[in-house]
Amino acid sequence: MPFIKSNVHTHTTFCDGQDSMEDMVKAAVSLGFDTLGFSFHSYTPFDPSYCIRDYYEYMREFERLRKEYGQTICLLNGVELDLYGERPSVCDFVIGSVHYLEENGRRYPVDFSARGFKKLVDGMFRGDALAAAERYYAEVRELAEKVKPDVYGHFDLITRFNQGGAFFDEESARYKSAALSAVESLPAGAVIEVNLGRLFKGEGGMCPSDRLTREMLSAGCRFM
């Protein structure tokens, strides 16, 4: 099977990314990529801080770049859709991700900061971080059922601030049971993103973890 150089989890200055769309295209071309997919954050009305800011301008720029660079690289228009986000009417692919936990109609981010995560655990789960992990993977299962994404993003994001077991024991029966339950909820041949964001930020290894990756391989998942 040939190796395809591609990335579809790409944020730009139209949401919470640091580089323009054209800069990302130029970088992908310079690296010999076959495909680059842009995936703006879907709009979440309860927290618009990181979401797409001007969808129509974004689409105009995307179409301009696809016309200009289309003979060199395949450009795709996608969305990173949260469980509570709004799905655009037109897109080439959907990355499904869980960024929030819900309690009594309110949503709390799981990956904003370690301090914020502790506040979530203390406020929502009375200090029981494993309960937070169980809720997270329950929402991953719900994502698989309701959103049915083309790609599953940063599958075990709940562990982002858990280096060295700072909040919970990833070897515990409770954690492994919750995570495995989420893996078992995936459809046959599900595509899982290998996300290196934590590795580059010095916050741990790749996402998903080695253990979950092995479970996913056994379940017939695919990776990108």
At which residue positions do the language-model features occur?
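A structural motif
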Residues: 33, 91, 148-149, 221
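A short helix->loop->beta-strand "cap" motif at the edges of active sites that frequently abuts
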Residues: 33, 73, 189-190, 221
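Domain-core and long-helix interface of multi-subunit machines
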Residues: 14, 96-101, 108-219
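Short acidic/histidine-rich active-site segments
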Residues: 41, 155, 221-224
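An N-terminally biased module of ancient metal coordination in phosphate/nucleic-acid-related enzymes
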Residues: 1-83, 148, 159-173, 181, ...
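Catalytic cores of alpha/beta
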Residues: 83-89
